[in-house]
A protein has these predicted regions:
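Active-site activation/catalytic loop segments of kinase-like enzymes and analogous catalytic loops
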Residues: 206-236, 250-268
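A general structural signal marking secondary-structure boundaries and capping sites
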Residues: 21, 82, 125-133, 169, ...
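ATP/Mg2+ or Mg2+-diphosphate-binding catalytic cores
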Residues: 258-284
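An alpha-helical support segment within catalytic cores of ATP-dependent transferases
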Residues: 8-25, 130-180, 184, 242, ...
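Start-of-helix signal in alpha-solenoid helical-repeat scaffolds, especially tetratricopeptide repeats
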Residues: 68, 247-251
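ATP-binding pocket architecture of kinase catalytic cores
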Residues: 31-137
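Active-site acidic catalytic loop and adjacent metal/ATP-binding pocket
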Residues: 34-46, 50-54, 165-207
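Short, surface-exposed acidic
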Residues: 23-29, 235-245
């Protein structure tokens, strides 16, 4: 009985989601996809045979430091730059987005050759940096402090772990449009198309590149190849002192740790615990 009740609730939730779409999309049916760590994702199939991608964002974006209005602003610009899939319907207040369907796999499932990845991502960054700089800023110190303040329980080991980093001084000399989550799951095909712009804001490009290195499992040489390819495409260095990305590696680890702690409080599970353990180890 419990299984039937759960299935009925799921069907009702999907019907309610379809009802929020304008015609003709509400006449379709939904197929749940493997969701990310924060969103619910679906393939929307229409009677015509066409498909679309439907994303329902996290219900508490403020807790995760997400600004929906800025996400939508950057997304619209990214479509114009050929970075993001065309959007047919959006409700920034709830994080609902209906996009073109893309059959190309993400880089987790089918990564391009490793030697090509730095240049491909340099192309993403050069186009991204042509967009207007958002008014909302994601500065690493303030962003991490917001995450920490929202923790219901601070682990006993955290104060000693974070002390050295918080006593340091991070670069704060360049602010550009940033995606802030260019991990392999958010890159589709060889173009690549970039999805999940939730954490988009003005940010330091060095943090963006440091985040790429960590989430792609790169060595320093691949990060340096990306930076060199960027300078060649852009016709010069970024900012007055370059990317300075090495200085942001511990900030990527720290923010990743706090994010995973926040998510684990809300929904404990092995995926979040693995991220906690990994980032804690990197900071030790």
């Amino acid at each position: 009985m419990a299984g039937k009740s759960s299935e009925a609730s799921l069907v009702a939730a999907e019907r309610a989601l379809l009802a929020r779409l304008p015609p003709p999309w509400r006449s379709g049916w939904l197929e749940p996809l493997a969701s990310g760590l924060t969103n619910c994702n679906y393939r929307l199939r229409l009677p015509s045979g066409r498909s679309h991608f439907l994303r329902q964002g996290h219900p508490d974006p403020v807790r995760l430091g997400i600004d929906r209005a800025t996400e939508w602003q950057l997304y619209q610009g990214a479509v114009g730059q050929g970075l993001a899939l065309p959007c047919h319907h959006s409700d920034p207040a709830t994080g609902l987005m209906l996009l073109d369907w893309c059959d190309e796999p993400n880089w987790l499932a089918a990564p391009p050759p490793a030697a090509l990845q730095p240049a491909l991502l340099a192309g993403v960054l050069t186009r991204l940096h042509r967009l207007p700089v958002p008014s909302v800023v994601m500065a690493v110190r303030a962003h991490s402090a917001g995450y920490r303040a929202r923790l219901a329980r601070v682990p006993a080991w955290l104060p000693a772990l974070e002390r050295g980093l918080l006593a340091s001084r991070e670069p704060a000399d360049c602010w550009l449009p940033c995606h802030h989550d260019l991990n392999p799951a958010n890159l589709l095909g060889s173009r690549p198309w970039v999805i999940d712009w939730e954490y988009g804001a003005a940010g330091h490009p060095g943090f963006e590149v440091a985040s790429i290195q960590r989430t792609h499992g790169w060595q320093d040489a691949q990060r340096e190849a990306l930076e060199q390819a960027y300078c060649e495409r852009a016709g010069g260095p970024v900012g007055p002192r370059g990317f300075q990305s090495r200085a942001f590696l511990p900030w990527v680890d720290y923010i990743g740790l706090l994010w995973a702690l926040l998510m684990a409080e809300q929904q404990p599970g092995p995926d979040y615990q693995a991220l906690i353990d990994l980032n804690r180890q990197r900071l030790e």
